[in-house]
C-alpha cells in the first residue's frame, strides 16, 4: 500500500528529530502546519519545556488575518514568534521544519523570523 502524505511527513519528521535537538543555549523552533493554521514553538528539549509559542489562532493575530492557512499568515506568525523570543532573551535557535518541505508557508515563517531578528 502506498504511503499517504501524512505518513511521509511523519517519516521525515522522525529523521529530522534524530539530528535536531534544542538546548537551553540554542532552543528548537518547531513548526507544525495544518491545513487551516500554522503553529510555532520555541522549545528547550533538555528541560522539555516550551519557552515561547505563537500561532494563527493567537489573540494578537486572530482579528487581523483573513485566513490562517496562507503565506501572509505564516509571515505574521514568524514575526510574532521572533518578537516574543527576543523579549525572553532568545536570539539563536535551531529550526525544526516538522517534516514539512522547506517551501511555501514553512519557508515564509522561517524568513519572517530571520528578518525579525532570530538567528538560525
Swiss-Prot record:
InterPro entries: Ribosomal_uL18_bac-type, Ribosomal_uL18_bac/euk
Pfam families: Ribosomal_L18p (PF00861)
GO cellular component, one term: cytosolic large ribosomal subunit
Gene3D superfamilies according to UniProt: 3.30.420.100
UniProt entry keywords in alphabetical sequence: Ribonucleoprotein, Ribosomal protein, RNA-binding, rRNA-binding
Coiled-coil stretches noted in the UniProt entry, renumbered to this chain: none
Entry GO MF terms: 5S rRNA binding; structural constituent of ribosome
Origin superkingdom: Bacteria
UniProt KW RNA-binding keyword: yes
GO biological process terms on file: translation
Subunit annotation: Part of the 50S ribosomal subunit; part of the 5S rRNA/L5/L18/L25 subcomplex. Contacts the 5S and 23S rRNAs.
Protein's name in the database: Large ribosomal subunit protein uL18
Phylogenetic classification of the source organism: Bacteria, Bacillati, Cyanobacteriota, Cyanophyceae, Oscillatoriophycideae
Gene name for this UniProt entry: rplR
Amino acid at each position: 500500500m502506498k504511503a499517504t502524505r501524512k505518513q511521509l511527513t511523519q517519516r521525515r519528521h522522525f529523521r529530522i528529530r534524530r539530528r535536531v535537538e534544542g538546548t537551553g543555549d540554542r532552543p528548537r523552533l518547531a513548526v507544525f502546519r495544518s491545513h487551516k493554521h500554522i503553529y510555532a514553538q520555541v522549545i528547550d528539549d533538555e528541560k522539555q519545556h516550551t519557552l515561547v509559542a505563537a500561532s494563527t489562532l493567537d489573540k494578537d493575530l486572530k482579528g487581523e488575518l483573513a485566513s490562517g492557512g496562507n503565506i501572509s499568515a505564516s509571515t505574521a506568525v514568524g514575526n510574532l514568534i521572533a518578537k516574543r523570543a527576543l523579549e525572553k532573551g532568545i536570539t539563536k535557535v535551531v529550526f525544526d521544519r516538522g517534516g514539512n518541505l522547506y517551501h511555501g508557508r514553512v519557508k515564509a515563517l522561517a524568513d519572517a523570523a530571520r528578518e525579525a531578528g532570530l538567528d538560525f
